[in-house]
Each structure stands twice: as structure tokens, then as C-alpha cells.
Swiss-Prot record:
This is Snaclec EMS16 subunit alpha. Residues 1-23 form the signal peptide. Disulfide bonds join 27-38, 55-152, 127-144. Expressed by the venom gland. GO terms for molecular function: toxin activity. Keywords: Disulfide bond, Hemostasis impairing toxin, Platelet aggregation inhibiting toxin, Secreted, Signal, Toxin. InterPro entries: C-type_lectin-like, C-type_lectin-like/link_sf, C-type_lectin/snaclec_domain, CTDL_fold. Residues 34-153 form the C-type lectin domain. PROSITE patterns: C_TYPE_LECTIN_2. GO terms for cellular component: extracellular region. Heterodimer of subunits A and B; disulfide-linked. EMS16 is a potent and selective inhibitor of alpha-2/beta-1 (ITGA2/ITGB1) integrin and acts as a potent antagonist of platelet aggregation and cell migration. Binds specifically to the I domain of the alpha-2 subunit, in a metal ion-independent fashion. It comes from the Eukaryota.
């Protein structure tokens, strides 16, 4: 009886510890879970607009990835580094400038607020991508028509 209680308690501890890590939801096959979101790294280069279109077609509320914290940025950098075996030096993210009357107006595609930024110093805020030279941590200004791999994201809750 004591062994049963010990094993049951151990399983309960494992379950409770996993439930706080996002293990309480499922992402589709090939997608990776992090902090109640699902992520998919795509190696097939697209321009920014086609990459965004692809992401919106993959899942409800799907978009090019928005990065809301340093921790999420580190996760995305690790995800990208794991699939980048080619020579591409940038990876699209879902941030771009929607200029209005010559004013910079950067916005995330998914409508989330910009609460964390990691722009490379001196960069303007047009279409943004992660750069290979900083292990995919810094955000760089890139011509929106250039072809690069990208990362999709959607909320799993």
C-alpha cells in the first residue's frame, strides 16, 4: 500500500510539473510547443508576404512568428538553428513597418503589442528577419521581396 501511494504521488508530481510547461496542449505533427503556442520552421524560402500567407493557411490565428520576450526569442533562435542547414542568412518574422504619413509604425502581424524588441542597432523597421550572424537573435531590416525561410506561430489555447 505504501509503495502504491509513493508511485501515485510521484506520478502526480510529474503530471503537475508538466502541466505548467505547455504539455497540457497538443500541437500538430511537425510543430513545436512553447508557452502555449505552436511553432513551425519552414526551410522553403518565400518572400515576406507569401510566408505570412502560408502561415495563415496552416492554422486558425496562424501568422509569421511574433516574439514577445527574450525567452521566446531564445526559443525561436534555437528552433531556427536546428533546421538551418543551408546558406540563408535571414529568417522571416512577423514584424513589419506599416508606414503612415512617413511615420514608422512597426506592428506584429498577429495584432499583438510590441512589448519586447531586439532590433539590430541602426536598423530601420521595415520587414524584419532574424540574422545568422547573431545566431538568429537580432532583428534586421530586409527587403520584403527577398526569399528566406520563416517561422509560423499560433496560439494553442
Amino acid at each position: 500500500m505504501g509503495r502504491f501511494i509513493s508511485v501515485s504521488f510521484g506520478l502526480l508530481v510529474v503530471f503537475l510539473s508538466l502541466s505548467g510547461t505547455g504539455a497540457d496542449f497538443d500541437c500538430p505533427s511537425d510543430w513545436t510547443a512553447y508557452d502555449q503556442h505552436c511553432y513551425l520552421a519552414i526551410g522553403e524560402p518565400q518572400n515576406w508576404y507569401e510566408a505570412e500567407r502560408f502561415c495563415t493557411e496552416q492554422a486558425k490565428d496562424g501568422h509569421l512568428v511574433s516574439i514577445q520576450s527574450r525567452e521566446e526569442g531564445n526559443f525561436v533562435a534555437q528552433l531556427v538553428s536546428g533546421f538551418m542547414h543551408r546558406s540563408e542568412i535571414y529568417v522571416w518574422i512577423g514584424l513589419r513597418d506599416r508606414r503612415e504619413e512617413q511615420q514608422c509604425n512597426p506592428e506584429w502581424n498577429d495584432g499583438s503589442k510590441i512589448i519586447y524588441v531586439n532590433w539590430k542597432e541602426g536598423e530601420s523597421k521595415m520587414c524584419q528577419g532574424l540574422t545568422k550572424w547573431t545566431n538568429f537573435h537580432d532583428w534586421n531590416n530586409i527587403n520584403c521581396e527577398d526569399l528566406y525561410p520563416f517561422v509560423c506561430k499560433f496560439s494553442a489555447v
